Amino acid sequence: KALAEKLHREMSTYRGVDLTENSRMTLGEWLDQWLEELVAPSVRESTLEGYRHHIQYHIKPRLGSKPISKITPDDVRKLYRDVQNHGRIREDPEYGHALSASSIRRLHGVFHLAMDAAVRDNLIARNPTEGVTLPRKTAVPKQILGDAQLERFLDVIREDDVWHDFFYTELTAGLRRGEICGLQWSDFDEAH
């Protein structure tokens, strides 16, 4: 009876789906094709490199040789668990060889897009990344300078015109470093 129910579920999954001959390709072959034919023409080079990194270092070594039609949500969960514990190539002082939750979320974003495209191209009936629980982001408590600490810090850097202006702007405007680095002189109003 359990086998019959499983068979019925599988049949209903594929009902109305006309899988193509390419359904036999491996996940690695699909990811290469997806990157070159569908992604590369429509994204910036830096985005493409980020996608390639996730695929080459995390997805393909673990699942690349498996037929795309055989990838299951359990495979995806195992992938995320494995990279969560052993995904970093070079050891990080804070994380060791583990990937952070936000890195796994970015990896999931890439994998999810690729598998959505496989569904649209009738390579698979459903996206196995759908509904997989992702690790929660760990909130790192922010260290905020007190008034006395802020005054001491500004006293120390006051002697250096470049750094004083940079940090004074950062601390008083509430901007992030990247936003400060992108400022132009035209962004400043000398009167105020």
Residue ranges and their predicted role:
Residues L38, I59, L63, V83-E91, ...:
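Structural motif corresponding to the C-terminal cap of alpha-helices
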Residues K6-Y14, E37, D82, H86, ...:
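Active-site catalytic microenvironments for nucleophilic, acid-base chemistry
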Residues S69-Q84, E130-P135:
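Short, conserved phosphate-binding/catalytic loop or strand-edge motifs used
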Residues A4, H108-F111:
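Short amphipathic alpha-helical coiled-coil/interface segments
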Residues V76, F111, M115, I180:
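Short, basic/aromatic-rich helical patch in the C-terminal catalytic core of site-specific tyrosine
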Residues Q56, H112-M115, V119:
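C-terminal flanking helix
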Residues I89-G109, R120-L183, E190-A191:
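Basic, Lys/Arg- and aromatic-enriched nucleic-acid-binding interface segment
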Residues K1-K78:
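N-terminal DNA-binding module of tyrosine recombinases/phage integrases
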